A protein has these predicted regions:
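Conserved alpha-helix/loop element of class I SAM-dependent methyltransferases that forms part
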Residues: 60-94
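Class I SAM-dependent methyltransferase SAM/SAH-binding core
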Residues: 94-151
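A short SAM/SAH-binding and catalytic strip from SAM-dependent methyltransferases
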Residues: 160-175
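A short glycine-rich, Lys/Arg-flanked "PGG" loop and its adjoining helix->strand segment in the class I
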Residues: 175-190
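Conserved class I S-adenosyl-L-methionine
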Residues: 190-223
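Short alpha-helix
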Residues: 235-258
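Core SAM-dependent methyltransferase catalytic element
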Residues: 251-253, 267-286
Length: 286
């Protein structure tokens, strides 16, 4: 009996060791996918979301485009609260850059209001949607498939407005994004940005318990990496207010206005806990 007990213990130990090694191998395989750059993982993830009917990948309708031409319109930087019209002002003849703003949702509205629109997005599907709406409505759009974590492919001081909806949660270094937005804006140009605060990244998937230590960075923490992979969430990063608003100030912007918003669904939304910030900032003449 003693021999059998030892044999069972030994076999059990071997099996546990084997399963552990297999699990570690699978994690390594997933990490190796990410090592082709987190930006490319996010590109593939968002392309897949668009194909699955993602809310922020559905192009605006013809009726909404016509309504905008008649002065009735709304666009979003965050999930539920429309951008105040006075934040944008008269758009006739204005040059707008939609930064990580593809999908055919905001740029068609701005075109209908008379703006000269350029959009940069790393998602192929979001860029396809821009061309789809432009062809349907008969206007030209400069739509560029590009990565905002790199130097933007534009000269200095050429845009009047940079419209940047929630998206820098997919970027590890947000300071670079704000610096580039400042560079491509004209003097007195405006940056409109939708921003995550840290709250979405401290809670579990049910939004009931605080489980994550900040900052949330899957490139530096195995547990958060596995969480992102399991949730089909791409690679996301938390950014605090120092990074999000302080980063704009550090880039040279002057903060003009601000509002908050919720997720639009889920327990945090039901509790009216604000998880997003929208900012209006200016590149004032010095």
């Amino acid at each position: 009996m003693q021999f059998r007990s030892r044999l069972f213990t030994m076999i059990n130990s071997i099996v546990k060791s084997w399963f552990t090694k297999v699990s570690e191998f699978l994690v390594v395989m997933e990490v190796s996918k990410i090592m082709k750059t987190y930006q490319d993982i996010n590109k593939e993830t968002i392309d897949r979301w668009v194909e699955e009917g993602w809310e922020w990948g559905k192009p605006t309708s013809h009726d909404a485009y016509i309504s905008a031409k008649n002065g009735e319109w709304k666009v979003f930087l965050t999930p539920t609260f429309p951008v105040p019209h006075e934040w944008l002002g008269d758009l006739k003849g204005k040059k707008i850059l939609g930064l990580a703003s593809g999908g055919g949702q905001q740029m068609p509205i701005f075109n209908a209001l008379g703006a000269d629109c350029t959009v940069l997005d790393y998602s192929s599907k979001q860029i396809e949607n821009e061309f789809l709406v432009a062809e349907r409505e008969g206007y030209n759009i400069k739509a560029i498939e590009g990565d905002m974590t790199k130097i933007l492919p534009f000269e200095n001081e050429i845009f009047d407005i940079v419209f940047h909806p929630v998206s820098n949660c997919y970027v590890e270094d947000v300071q670079h994004v704000f610096n580039e937005a400042y560079r491509v804006l004209k003097k007195n140009g405006i940056l409109l940005a939708g921003l995550n605060n840290e709250i979405n990244y401290i809670v579990d998937s049910e939004e009931r318990e605080i489980i994550w230590r900040m900052p949330f960075n899957p490139l530096k923490d195995k547990a958060s990496l596995e969480y992102m992979i399991k949730g089909n969430s791409g690679i996301q990063f938390s950014h605090n207010i120092t990074e999000q608003i302080g980063g704009q100030l550090k880039a040279g912007f002057t903060l003009l206005d601000i509002y908050e918003d919720t997720n639009g669904s889920g327990r945090l939304h039901e509790m009216n806990i604000k998880t997003y910030i929208a900012t209006k900032s200016a590149k004032l003449s010095k």
